[in-house]
């Protein structure tokens, strides 16, 4: 007769919001890189170097990119993008639905509507 001890360890994922905020911070501080090809004894080798040397070199945990994002403001039939012209925007928002970002600096039109509706009020 012996004793048995059970020990269980596990990792749990943080809340989805925490992960999203972390990734957004990484995205916002991603470093643009230049792909340089050069020949070595083992063949062609590609190396990544920072495009802007005034910035700190990225670490293993930083996000990097070497292709700039397309301009989503203007229509692009090749990618199927319709652009953002004539889209509805939220004038009070500073997020992705806000007029400042969504209208790409082109300005925006404001439309005021008057509606007459039955409210089914009981007095």
Curated annotation (Swiss-Prot):
Glycans are attached at residue 90. One of its GO terms (biological process) is cell fate commitment. Disulfide bonds have critical and distinct roles in secretion and activity. Loss of each conserved cysteine results in high molecular weight oxidized Wnt oligomers, which are formed through inter-Wnt disulfide bonding. Palmitoleoylation is required for efficient binding to frizzled receptors. Depalmitoleoylation leads to Wnt signaling pathway inhibition. The keyword Secreted applies. One of its GO terms (cellular component) is extracellular space. The keyword Disulfide bond applies. Keywords: Developmental protein, Disulfide bond, Extracellular matrix, Glycoprotein, Lipoprotein, Secreted, Wnt signaling pathway. Ligand for members of the frizzled family of seven transmembrane receptors. Functions in the canonical Wnt signaling pathway that results in activation of transcription factors of the TCF/LEF family. Required for normal embryonic mesoderm development and formation of caudal somites. Required for normal morphogenesis of the developing neural tube. This is Protein Wnt-3a. It comes from Alopias vulpinus. The lineage of its organism: Eukaryota, Metazoa, Chordata, Craniata, Vertebrata.
